[in-house]
Regions:
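Flexible, compositionally biased loop and terminal segments
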Residues: 1-186
Length: 186
């Protein structure tokens, strides 16, 4: 590791040189759940939107650190299916932040050869956001740098429901014999 990593480790423990990190011990994949932006803002007497904006800055820093450290995959869990139950003005503000982030994310991806994928159920997102996602994924699909995955409108329960519906529909249409459904076919 020969990059200047002082910004990641501004005050390393005594005897630790960040430039001597063993690349073999750097994880290939890192996942971050974006939780607590509202609490962060409240603790600082700021409105929740300021917390969400700070969260976006944290994502930018995570991308930079992951790239510099040689992490291959970075997944950010940013907006769960449960987040739709927040007050409508907060959901609207989050969608506006997402729209703006998609623009800057493309610039970052182009600059750093980053491949971007958006995970989750995109059907509930507005058409313009789905279009931006499709453009971003298409523009970056052949990039060979950090693989950045953004989970939007995701949820464990929702994933299970969608996983069950797919083979159920095939059984109902006669395409698949129920006896043929195994863990591998799911």
């Amino acid at each position: 590791m020969n990059k200047d990593l002082d910004y990641i480790f501004p005050d390393p423990p005594e005897g630790v040189d960040p430039r001597a990190l063993d690349p073999e011990r750097i994880p290939e994949s890192v996942a971050i759940i974006m939780d607590g932006n509202g609490r962060w803002a409240k603790k600082r007497a700021l409105n929740r939107l300021k917390g969400h904006k700070a969260g976006i800055e944290a994502v930018r820093e995570a991308i930079r650190c992951a790239s510099d450290l040689g992490v291959r995959y970075l997944t950010i869990y940013s907006f769960s299916t449960e987040n739709w139950s927040r007050p409508q003005d907060e959901v609207d503000a989050l969608m506006k932040l997402l729209r703006n982030y998609m623009k800057t994310c493309l610039k970052t991806a182009e600059k750093n050869r980053m491949c971007v994928r958006v995970l989750g159920d995109k059907t509930r997102l507005d058409e313009d956001i789905r279009t931006r996602i499709a453009e971003l994924e298409e523009a970056t699909k052949n990039n060979d740098g950090l693989h950045f995955q953004i989970a939007i409108n995701y949820g464990g329960r929702d994933e299970i429901v969608r996983a069950v519906k797919k083979p159920s529909a095939k059984v109902q249409s006669g395409e698949v014999d129920p006896a043929g459904i195994t863990a591998d076919t799911l």
